[in-house]
From Swiss-Prot:
CC terms in the record's Gene Ontology section: cytoplasm
Major location category of this protein: cytoplasm
Keyword Cytoplasm: yes
Species in which this protein is naturally found: Haloferax volcanii (strain ATCC 29605 / DSM 3757 / JCM 8879 / NBRC 14742 / NCIMB 2012 / VKM B-1768 / DS2)
Remaining remarks: There are 3 CRISPR RNA loci in this organism and a single cas gene locus. A CRISPR-Cas type I-B system.
Compartmental location: Cytoplasm
Protein name: CRISPR-associated protein Cas7
Function: CRISPR (clustered regularly interspaced short palindromic repeat) is an adaptive immune system that provides protection against mobile genetic elements (viruses, transposable elements and conjugative plasmids). CRISPR clusters contain sequences complementary to antecedent mobile elements and target invading nucleic acids. CRISPR clusters are transcribed and processed into CRISPR RNA (crRNA). Plasmid targeted by CRISPR locus P1 transform wild-type cells very poorly.
Disulfide bonds: none
Family annotation (InterPro entries): Cas7_Csh2/Csh2, CRISPR-assoc_prot_Cas7/Csh2
Upper classification of the organism: Archaea, Methanobacteriati, Methanobacteriota, Stenosarchaea group, Halobacteria
UniProtKB keywords: Antiviral defense, Cytoplasm, Plasmid
Regions that span the bilayer: none
Gene: cas7
Pfam families, per the entry: Cas_Cas7
Quaternary organization: Component of the Cascade-like complex (Cascade I-B), composed of Cas5, Cas6, Cas7 and crRNA.
Length: 340
């Protein structure tokens, strides 16, 4: 297996008049830091978008719902392996771990726990024993993200807080109604930081093609998986994958190198009010340029970026980095997408 280069990911997206990540133990209100007021989106939420997009692209995934229902790990592994129902079927596979990782695309990225539930049936127990002897207790995913905190303090839109839905009887009469908890933020812009660990990639068979797939997967997942009523209003704005030369080096914490520019509006309501200052990011990339192999970049022209005294559109960021001497790959999200 080819040794991968280590990569850092910086993925910025925004959320307008929606609930980007409700807290189920907090009345499903949008997550916020109680001290700073910053909005929060968990890495779990982002990974769910990515898994769902992988599945829509035709790739098998392990962690999923089928027909809207959650299932046991035993049911999930039978589903992802396809045609495997008992211990004899597992034996016919030969190398079970290789077959599982080949099929479970999401596990190659994010890892998973593989403890299987006990059963009173002898046949099921034999299957569980065969699984446990063939697979580790867990795979640690080589692709990980930190939860994201918004660059701005977010406000909850109280106008959406209580909404009454009226059901029609079909005879022109309105019958009853019920309240919908509709808790949304006015606007937030969220930078995610992630790491592709070249060492951990070997344990899950993460391939070069898998890593390159991230360059379009993240963008398209935000476009395609945020179409429900409460999630609509999220858009990808900037994606940068810093692919390093061989070795175990990375800068770390690229999200902390971004801040709101001075020309941002005092009260943010849409991307038109935002300027993101990427000066420190650009300076950092220049400082470690001899350690960087390639910068993989795509941006949305509706987001403005400050670099020193210059303001550019995010879709021009790749060109700015190229002119600064970096080897830059301008990502074509649609033409480079990888479908199964």
């Amino acid at each position: 297996m080819t040794t991968l280069n280590r990569s850092e990911l910086l993925f910025v997206y925004d959320a307008q008049d929606c609930n980007p990540n409700g807290n189920p133990i907090g009345d499903n209100r949008p997550r916020r830091d109680p001290d700073t007021g910053q909005g929060i989106i968990t890495d779990v939420r982002l990974k769910r978008y990515l898994r769902d997009q992988l599945q829509d692209d035709g790739f098998d995934i392990y962690v999923k719902k089928t027909e809207g229902r959650s299932h046991t790990r035993t049911k999930l592994i039978k589903d992802v392996l396809g045609g495997v129902d008992d211990a004899d079927d597992l034996e016919d596979l030969g190398d079970v771990a290789e077959a599982f990782l080949d099929a479970a695309t999401d596990v190659r990225y994010f890892g998973s726990t593989l403890s299987f539930e006990a059963s009173d049936k002898d046949e099921d127990e034999a299957f569980r024993d065969a699984l446990n002897s063939s697979l580790p207790n867990n795979y640690q995913g080589p692709v990980q993200f930190l939860p994201s905190k918004s660059l701005n303090e977010v406000e909850e839109n109280e106008e959406y807080d209580s909404l009454t839905s009226v059901i029609s009887t079909g005879e022109g009469n309105r019958q009853g109604g019920f309240d919908l908890d509709d808790k949304r933020i006015k606007y937030g812009i969220f930078p995610f930081w992630g790491l592709v660990d070249n060492n951990g990639a070997e344990s899950t068979n993460l391939s070069q093609a898998d890593v390159e797939r991230l360059d379009t997967l993240c963008w398209r997942a935000l476009k395609n998986q945020t179409t429900s009523r409460s999630k609509l209003g999220q858009e990808p704005r900037l994606y940068v994958r810093v692919e390093y030369e061989e070795g175990n080096y990375h800068v770390g914490g690229l999200q902390n190198l971004l801040e709101l520019g001075d020309d941002s509006s005092e009260s943010l309501r849409s991307v038109k009010d935002v300027v993101v200052d990427v000066t420190e990011l650009v300076e950092t990339l220049e400082r470690v340029a001899d350690r960087i192999d390639t910068l993989h970049v795509v941006g949305d022209g509706r987001l403005e970026l400050d670099i020193g005294d210059e303001t550019i559109r995010a879709d021009e960021f790749w060109s700015h980095l190229s002119e600064a001497g970096h080897d830059v790959h301008e990502i074509d999200v649609l033409n480079e997408r990888d479908l199964a």
